Design a protein with these regions (language model features):
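Eukaryotic N-terminal targeting leaders
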Residues: 1-4
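C-terminal cap of thioredoxin/glutaredoxin-like
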Residues: 8-11, 23-35, 42, 46, ...
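Short cysteine clusters
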Residues: 16-19
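Structural alpha/beta surface segment adjacent to cysteine/selenocysteine redox centers
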Residues: 24-126
Length: 207
């Protein structure tokens, strides 16, 4: 008998604009898949990953960071065009965040099953509202929305660092978002075509 549940491990970083796009495509694909398989449950387990832990703790100016890393921000032109097609806007992208503390808040939200909502709020704050999600005041405001009081602690910090290292060392992840389907062990990296996500879900369901 085919399984009626699918579990996906997702490694992601809020400072990764392709993660915003890739996860939005995934959510759209998931809705499409569930319309065909309404009795199926899809569980996404979010894991913290930091692309550039050396980003200044307070975050960095968007353009300055791009110039330092890549010489310019010209690579974002295609990104923004793709994002626009699925409702991901980057109109107020002002900071390149150090995401350690944002991931700590995300870890706290996982204890209460609020991670799926809060991660998209973090993306919107960063890319659409021009907020610096390295800033504790910004994160505290978001924490209040979800009634998360004790997020800024050593336990959450250690969990972030642990998941980051597991992703990089155990699973050899060098790019995010990375979706790993537990039933098949198959992977999807990046902002893949919606049909690819649906195909992998179909394979997972047959296991």
């Amino acid at each position: 008998m085919s399984s009626q549940s699918i579990t996906i491990d997702l490694w992601t970083d809020i400072a990764c604009p392709w993660c915003y796009i890739g996860e939005t495509i995934f959510e759209l694909s998931k809705s499409s898949f569930l319309s065909l398989h309404p009795s199926t449950t899809i569980t996404t387990i979010i894991h913290s990953y930091m692309i550039d832990p050396s980003t200044k703790p307070e975050g960095e100016d968007y353009l300055s960071y791009n110039k330092r890393r890549w010489g310019s921000d010209s690579w974002t032109i295609q990104l923004k065009e793709i994002g626009k097609q699925i409702g991901c806007n980057f109109k107020n992208w002002k900071f390149w965040a150090n995401t350690l503390k944002a991931h700590m808040l995300l870890q706290e939200s996982k204890k209460f099953g609020k991670e799926d909502e809060i991660i998209f709020d973090l993306y919107r704050l960063s890319y659409e509202e021009g907020k610096n999600i390295s800033n504790e005041n910004v994160l505290n405001d978001l924490a209040k929305k979800y009634e998360l009081k004790e997020w800024n602690n050593e336990s959450n910090k250690m969990k972030v660092l642990e998941e980051d290292q597991i992703g990089k060392n155990k699973f050899d992840i060098h790019g995010v978002p990375m979706f790993i389907f537990k039933e098949t062990g198959r992977k999807i990296e990046g902002a893949a075509d919606p049909k690819k996500f649906v195909y992998e879900m179909e394979l997972a369901l047959k296991k």
